[in-house]
A protein has these predicted regions:
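Juxtamembrane/disordered regions of integral membrane proteins
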Residues: 1-150
Length: 150
């Protein structure tokens, strides 16, 4: 059952990340002065994190067993981290390069290198977090089903 939902989960996770990156890029492009953590950016990040966590929890709920949940969550996370991280990197490349150029003289390879590290970390963190959250979703669904009637 999880195999049929994993591609949809990847698409949802990539879309969540792309929306978040587009809004962040717009905020960075409009900023004057050094970047600051604002409530709108904080709320956007929190909403994206909650939506992503929900996708992984549902994926785990649909899994047949604990092992399948961890595997589906980790593989979905790795793929979503790779594809979504790359999409995010392309979206925020311009605004980040402009922001860095305002405050520092760095080699041309610096921003693309930093974004490549971002993609690699997104892949790893999404795989680990996805596996853990999917396992949690499986455990929560199993606990809800095994309760005795009141």
């Amino acid at each position: 059952m999880t195999r049929t939902w994993a591609p949809a989960a990847v698409v949802l996770l990539v879309a969540i990340g792309a929306i978040e990156a587009r809004v962040s890029a717009q905020q960075l492009g409009e900023s004057v002065g050094p970047p600051r953590l604002e409530s709108a950016g904080l709320m956007l990040t929190a909403a994206g994190l909650l939506a992503s966590a929900f996708v992984y929890l549902v994926l785990g709920h649909l899994a047949q067993d604990d092992r399948a949940a961890v595997r589906a969550g980790a593989l979905t996370g790795a793929l979503a981290g790779l594809v979504g991280g790359t999409v995010r990197a392309f979206i925020i490349d311009g605004p980040v390069a402009d922001l860095v150029a305002r405050y520092a003289a760095v080699p041309e390879w610096f921003v693309p290198g930093a974004l490549a590290v971002f993609v690699a970390l997104a892949c790893v963190v999404s795989a680990v977090g996805g596996g853990a959250l999917a396992w949690t979703g499986r455990r929560l669904s199993r606990a809800a089903r095994s309760r005795p009637p009141a």
